[in-house]
Amino acid sequence: MFKVFPFTAIVHPHAITAPRLVVKMSAIATKNAVESLVVKPPAHPTYDLKGVIQLALSEDAGDLGDVTCKATIPIDMESEAHFLAKEDGIVAGIALAEMIFAEVDPSLKMEWSINDGDKVHKGLKFGKVQGKAHSIVIAERVVLNFMQRMSGIATLTKAMADAAHPATILETRKTAPGLRLVDKWAVLIGGGKNHRMGLFDMVMIKDNHISAAGGVSKALNSVDQYLEQNKLQMGVEVETRTIAEVREVLDYASQTKTSLTRIMLDNMVVPLSNGDIDVSMLKEAVDLINGRFETEASGNVTLETVHKIGQTGVTYISSGALTHSVKALDISLKIDTELALEVGRRTKRA
């Protein structure tokens, strides 16, 4: 049976003349709309999700709109189109698809037999949209572009999250430009967790910061002073590349009051010529830290290696591959031809 999920149009309260959705504590501004989502989008103080949708539709429409639709589809023709999974995977982007359809034509009605995060098998019809055929076709490609990408991310995330257990899988900032929140939302739908959203919500001391500061300890000390002077409270992570750097961080933390919360263990997974990996350095670092801080493994993380990495006791495993080079899930949206012809004959247009 198909279930109908209500959709509430979202308007940012301070933009009366030009409604825009600015994502703050969630991408939805009303309580009911938030509660209707299976997985809420991550928080972002400035991300304009409605603006992203409008931009995607605008780049497709250009200055003349859909000239093919205008030429071939009667403006008042009603139709129904079905979402079809063309391969197995995890579906993500249902909530976003509803936002896009509503932006194109608020009169369109959607029904779904599944939720975001559910598994689909090849050949399954898992949703439908009803209304003006013109509107459905105009929205089709933008909806599918988002849904296929999000579903690809969610599918890989689910596989990696299952394999990484008991470690938690994270994505990175290696997202498609302009789609940061959308990509990270898909990771949540797939069962992963979000790393920092951007440069603003977590201090992350990486190799370039360490080089510029003159060493790991100096970089940490500068961060601690900065946070204290500016009365800021947020997570602090430092990248380490060797066991010596791990010892230096632990040394610093034992002698100084610090805001440090997590230690990244970068490229401590060593690929071997036989295709396996050596995690002995990573395991040594985790044992050395001994639960005093969260740990994050990074580098040489794939679906094939993530299980072995997860068995080292590391808290988190981050993978840029979740978002920077993911394969889209094959999904189509097809108009019910018989229904369209029936309506066309009835209105003497077919």
Curated annotation (Swiss-Prot):
GO terms for cellular component: cytoplasm. Transmembrane segments: none annotated. Its EC number is 2.4.2.19. Gene3D superfamilies: Aldolase class I, Quinolinate phosphoribosyl transferase, N-terminal domain. Pathway: Alkaloid biosynthesis; nicotine biosynthesis; Cofactor biosynthesis; NAD(+) biosynthesis; nicotinate D-ribonucleotide from quinolinate: step 1/1. InterPro entries: Aldolase_TIM (IPR013785), NadC (IPR004393), NadC/ModD (IPR027277), Nicotinate_pribotase-like_C (IPR036068), Quinolinate_PRibosylTase_N_sf (IPR037128), Quinolinate_PRibosylTrfase_C (IPR002638), Quinolinate_PRibosylTrfase_N (IPR022412). Ubiquitously present at low levels with higher levels at the apical meristem. It catalyses: nicotinate beta-D-ribonucleotide + CO2 + diphosphate = quinolinate + 5-phospho-alpha-D-ribose 1-diphosphate + 2 H(+). PANTHER family: NICOTINATE-NUCLEOTIDE PYROPHOSPHORYLASE [CARBOXYLATING]. Involved in the biosynthesis of pyridine alkaloid natural products, leading mainly to the production of anabasine, anatabine, nicotine and nornicotine, effective deterrents against herbivores with antiparasitic and pesticide properties (neurotoxins); nornicotine serves as the precursor in the synthesis of the carcinogen compound N'-nitrosonornicotine (NNN). Involved in the catabolism of quinolinic acid (QA). Belongs to the NadC/ModD family. This is Quinolinate phosphoribosyltransferase [decarboxylating] 1a.
